[in-house]
């Protein structure tokens, strides 16, 4: 069934094991291994899809459509179900927690490159005017990435009368200058 002239091909069972990915991505593999989650790297980043083994014409005609690994290496499609926010105003403090709920390794994670989460907080008064702002960068190189299923807490002292906090979380992959929106939240006092 595997025909790809002019060379022989075979199926290597190691390609569907997370240990295969771990040979290069040691840090991320160690994070994943520590979670005890059984899903493999390939299940998330290379989900199976119905396609031909090779897509180059005319060799593609030699193969039937079957379940093969998606080689787009999906990543970074985070949303509010992945990173949870708990927040409250308490006196002169604004406290909040972030929780990586679904990604079974640190977010972001990298053995190479510098992916980042950017957290922007804007504080507004009753009139809707900005009275303060802050930014956090969550990155593996700074040891500030969000571990799987562990709350990370932040606390800000408020020096002005604040009615609400607008929070924006963005993700920047290691190979992009673009920051993609993960979610936006408004917390009222």
Protein language model features and the residues they cover:
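Extracellular Ig-like/FN3 beta-sandwich strand-entry sites
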Residues: 162-164
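Primarily the internal scaffold of c-type cytochrome electron-transfer domains
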Residues: 1-160, 173-188
